């Protein structure tokens, strides 16, 4: 059986790690063993923060909607409840964008929700 020399595969594996470590400081960018540790940790951070980004943006949208809704005399919880009463199917991302960039359209939605809330209170 022929002898297997692993230099080619080792070189390819090392190149892959060094390529991922591009831009790092010190020996982290060109010393394989150190670069491997840094790259593994960076990939762990990336995996974690892809999930955290979703949480962060949802909370940011809620804060923006809450601030805009309070300017019109409503609470966030009442606003969200009114959305379902008025059959408005806009998500928080779109509502937050409207609250920041299209204030007149957002005010129309708030007025629509206020009417829906008043109708539900009268019906009770």
UniProtKB/Swiss-Prot annotation:
The name of this protein is Large ribosomal subunit protein bL20
NCBIfam families cross-referenced by the UniProt entry: rplT_bact
Organism domain of life: Bacteria
Q: Does the keyword Signal apply?
A: no
What's a Pfam family in this record? Ribosomal_L20
Q: Which GO terms describe its cellular component?
A: ribonucleoprotein complex; ribosome
An MF annotation (GO) of this entry: structural constituent of ribosome
The UniProt keyword set, sorted, is:
Ribonucleoprotein, Ribosomal protein, RNA-binding, rRNA-binding
Q: Does the keyword Nucleotidyltransferase apply?
A: no
Q: Which organism is it from?
A: Ehrlichia chaffeensis (strain ATCC CRL-10679 / Arkansas)
Q: Function, please?
A: Binds directly to 23S ribosomal RNA and is necessary for the in vitro assembly process of the 50S ribosomal subunit. It is not involved in the protein synthesizing functions of that subunit.
Query: Which SUPFAM superfamilies does UniProt cross-reference here?
Result: Ribosomal protein L20
Organism classification, top ranks?
Bacteria, Pseudomonadati, Pseudomonadota, Alphaproteobacteria, Rickettsiales
Among the GO biological process terms of this entry, one is: ribosomal large subunit assembly
Q: Which family does it belong to?
A: Belongs to the bacterial ribosomal protein bL20 family.
